């Protein structure tokens, strides 16, 4: 990269920085001070730069955006180790686990799915399919007919989205940041508590940070006042620019809370 400043041309490289100007001086790794222009350059060797770059890459790689699309989750998928942002390969991710891990994760997924409104799913599994077992399909067993599996094509949108969120929390690397778009989409409002409890439990157990978006006042009410420091809301100014605001910094928050819940504040267009 080259930067031209007044009469000097600065060339940036991973090993060195050269200053090519009137004097024709070269600068090698170390420290260079241009007192005339009040510029200080500190340069590093390649290993340090590569290590720093690797840390940045690892940080961004551990940011996972999840917006499950039930229509795509109902199809067969390839067995793979990383969950796609649309959740379409949930079954493949489960099948890629070791037999012990797969059994454990499926048991946990099943335990969190049971309280859903249908209350008839008692087990969720994923199985390889096809001649060479390279694809996978999601199945569940219901109380209505314990011997007859139901594949993903027979599951509701809310159930599939919920399963994708649970699988993501159970399989992403610790210390990841999981961004979930419309976290309660398709889920019955009466199960907001189960959703919040699941997010709190698994994020704490797996040491995963979770950032969710929602337009559901019921879910906001379920979070409770203790979560106010962790809630933000988005507004737009007269130019149409969006701004993220901390709820705890809202003016007259105590007065607003005295007249209703967080969800009620949203319904009344107070936030």
Language-model features and meaning:
Residues 1-125:
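Electropositive, glycine-dotted interaction segments
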Residues 8, 89, 157, 161-168, ...:
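Phosphate-binding glycine-rich loops of NTP-binding sites
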Residues 55-63, 170, 183, 197:
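Short, Φ-rich (hydrophobic/aromatic) sequence segments
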Residues 93, 146-151, 242-243:
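Short small-residue beta-strand/loop micro-motif enriched in glycine and branched aliphatics
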Residues 118, 122-170, 177-190:
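Conserved ABC ATPase signature
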Residues 194-271:
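C-terminal lobe/lid and adjacent interdomain/linker elements of RecA-like ASCE P-loop ATPase modules
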């Amino acid at each position: 990269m080259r930067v031209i400043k007044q009469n000097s041309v600065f060339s940036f490289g991973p090993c060195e920085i050269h200053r090519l100007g009137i004097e024709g001086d070269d600068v090698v790794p170390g420290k260079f001070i241009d007192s005339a222009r009040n510029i200080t350059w500190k340069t590093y060797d390649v290993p340090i730069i590569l290590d720093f770059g690797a840390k940045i890459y690892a940080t961004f790689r551990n940011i996972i955006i999840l917006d499950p699309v039930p229509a795509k989750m109902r199809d067969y998928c390839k067995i793979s180790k990383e969950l796609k942002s649309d959740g379409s390969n949930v079954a493949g991710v489960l099948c890629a686990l070791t037999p012990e891990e797969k059994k454990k994760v499926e048991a946990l997924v099943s335990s969190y799915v049971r309280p859903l409104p249908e209350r008839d799913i008692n087990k969720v599994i994923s199985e390889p399919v096809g001649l060479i077992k390279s694809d996978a399909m999601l199945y569940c067993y219901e109380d209505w007919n314990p011997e007859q599996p139901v594949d993903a094509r027979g599951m509701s949108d809310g159930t599939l989205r919920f399963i994708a969120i649970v699988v993501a929390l159970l399989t992403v690397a610790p210390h990841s940041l999981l961004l979930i778009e419309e976290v309660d989409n398709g889920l019955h409002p009466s199960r907001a508590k189960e959703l919040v409890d699941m997010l709190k439990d698994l994020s704490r157990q797996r040491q995963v940070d979770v950032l969710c978006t929602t337009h559901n006042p019921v879910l906001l009410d379920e979070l409770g006042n203790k979560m106010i420091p962790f809630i933000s809301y988005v507004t737009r100014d007269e130019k149409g620019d969006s701004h993220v605001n901390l709820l705890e910094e809202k003016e007259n928050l105590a007065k607003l809370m005295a007249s209703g819940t967080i969800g009620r504040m949203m319904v009344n267009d107070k936030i």
